[in-house]
A protein has these predicted regions:
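Short, solvent-exposed helix-to-loop capping segments enriched in aromatics
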Residues: 42-53
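Residue-level detector of alpha-helical recognition elements and their boundaries
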Residues: 25, 29-32, 36, 53, ...
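Enriched for short, Lys/Arg-rich terminal
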Residues: 25, 70-74, 78-103
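PIN-domain endoribonuclease scaffold, especially VapC-family toxins
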Residues: 5, 33-43, 62-69
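Basic/aromatic recognition patch in beta-strand/loop cores that engages polyanionic ligands
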Residues: 51-82
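Arg/Lys-rich, positively charged N-terminal/basic patches that mediate binding to nucleic acids
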Residues: 1-37
């Protein structure tokens, strides 16, 4: 079993997603639903961190990222086998060009 860690940017991303859906789209029920889905998906990585293949970018990155679709959002994470840890780096709108956000 792996520990799951959220980087501050990932937490900020998730808060912004939930607030946007609740306030801008006037749909607090949908906001609560996506918050639950994001939390459940993050926790599922404890047991199945390799559920998705590694993301192959055009340029070299510091980490071997994996991406997991959660409704309309992409959860970007990497796995540290030595530390038995999954680090969730970002959560972004799936149609966004997220390659610029990764290091």
């Amino acid at each position: 079993m792996y520990n799951v860690e959220y980087l501050p940017l990932a937490v900020q991303d998730m808060v912004e997603i939930v607030v946007y859906i609740a306030r801008n789209l006037y749909n607090p029920a949908a906001a609560e639903h996506i918050a639950d889905q994001l939390a459940e998906t993050g926790e599922s990585l404890r047991d199945f961190p390799y559920v998705q293949p590694a993301y192959t970018p055009l340029r070299p990155l510091k980490h071997e990222y994996r991406k997991l679709l959660v409704e309309n959002y992409m959860m970007l994470y990497w796995v540290s086998e030595t530390e038995k840890r999954v680090t969730i780096a970002r959560v972004v709108y799936a149609r966004r060009n997220y390659t610029k956000l990764l290091e």
